[in-house]
Amino acid sequence: MRSLFAATLALLALASAARAQTKQQLVDDWERQRTNVLAYVDAMPDSAMAFRPTPGVRDFAQQIVHFVATNLEVAAISLRGLKEAPFTLDTTQLHQKAALRDYTDRVYGYLLEALKGATPSQLLKQSSLYNLPAQSATRWLNLSYEHAVWTLGQTVPYLRLNGVTPPGYKQPL
């Protein structure tokens, strides 16, 4: 019976390791996301940065900043152990395409630098953000990535309603 239990534990450990994303895969995913997000910002006309498809929803620039700022907070708090994001976008420049693009690129640069420099113990370190239960840095990064993909997808109609074909998605494989 003990042998069966030990074998089951070993199989579970192997299955978990097989599912685990490597640090390089995380870096590759975040670099690809950076490319995709910057392509969306580049595609949207300057005149449409404040465009919103209906009243009461975020405009295009606000949508981008919403998830990009979250990515920055996750990197700063979960990877670097800071209390808050190390920089923000000047809100007076929110709807200036060049400023939005620069902020977005800077955030992804910060996140990627923090991720590339993270040790295995930093990736496993538990932290709590947004009054939610503590999670590992890797889990926070995955949740932030998912949030960014979801929110970027919401901007497709913003582009189309301004006569812009959304940029093609860069496949990971």
Enumerate the predicted regions with their spans.
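Bacterial N-terminal signal peptides that target proteins for export
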Residues: 1-8, 17
